[in-house]
A protein has these predicted regions:
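Juxtamembrane/interface motifs at transmembrane-helix termini
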Residues: 37-38, 83-85, 138-139
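Gram-negative outer-membrane beta-barrel transporters
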Residues: 69-71, 93-207
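Membrane-embedded beta-barrel scaffold of Gram-negative outer-membrane proteins
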Residues: 9, 15-25, 41-116, 120-122, ...
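Extracytoplasmic loops and strand-loop junctions of Gram-negative outer membrane beta-barrel proteins
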Residues: 1, 31-36, 85-92, 157-166, ...
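Transmembrane beta-barrel architecture of outer membranes
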Residues: 1-3, 35-37, 45-49, 175
Length: 209
């Protein structure tokens, strides 16, 4: 794994940065006795990020923004299968490739020394970017006549459904929040008045295939 980072500061209060990072998540094995996937390989990711951090208006306004892209190979996902004996097991498999891209924005404003107003917003577009035609984790012909392969909970037609461009599970497309914190000094200490609000977009829970 490696990380390359380039920083540029046009002023004392502003920073631009560009980074490229690689990483991986180790593979493993599935514990289900009737699992169609005894083992799965490691997951690899390459991330690209361009961002800005800056303070303005006599350091009363702070703006942080970034745009990013993650490219996954053999990304880990869950898949449910049914054995020829009728048992159901949940296994981890590696989907060939996926891509996540989006941007984040954070703004913090201090109208008075004891009053802070802030908010953030993020947008994420996470999709599978390569086909998989075999629910058993293999690209190619489904082994319909293999008596040793557990039967899928999905039909053969559903197992052949392409996933290129399908949204990834459990990743909200939009998230945002806002808050206001006012600090009142009193004898012997202080009192904070905090009000916050947050919202998260709907997510997909079902399997990709």
């Amino acid at each position: 794994n490696y990380r390359v980072n380039v920083d540029y500061s046009p002023t004392d209060n502003a920073l631009w940065y560009l980074s490229v990072t690689t990483g991986h998540r180790a593979g493993g094995f599935n514990l289900g006795y009737f699992s169609a996937f005894p083992t799965y390989d490691s997951e690899n990711v390459t991330s690209y990020e361009l961002g800005h951090k800056g303070s303005y208006m006599d350091n009363t306004l702070q703006i942080n923004a970034s745009t990013y892209q993650y490219v996954y190979e053999n990304i880990h996902g869950q898949f449910e299968s049914q054995s020829f004996l009728g048992g159901v097991s949940t296994s981890v498999i590696g989907y060939p490739e996926a891509e996540t891209k989006g941007f984040e924005l954070e703004v913090v404003y201090m109208p008075e020394p004891n009053w802070i107003i802030g908010g953030n917003y993020s947008y994420t577009d996470a999709r599978y970017s390569e086909e998989i035609v075999d629910a058993f984790g293999n690209q190619g012909v489904i082994q319909v006549n293999n008596p040793n392969a557990p039967g899928s909970l999905y039909t053969i037609k559903e197992r052949e459904r392409p996933i290129n461009g399908v949204k990834m599970e459990r990743i909200p497309e939009n998230k945002m929040s806002m808050y206001s914190n006012y600090t009142q000094e009193v004898n012997g200490g202080s009192i904070d008045y905090l009000v916050g609000w947050s919202w998260t977009d709907s997510i997909i829970w079902s399997d990709a295939v």
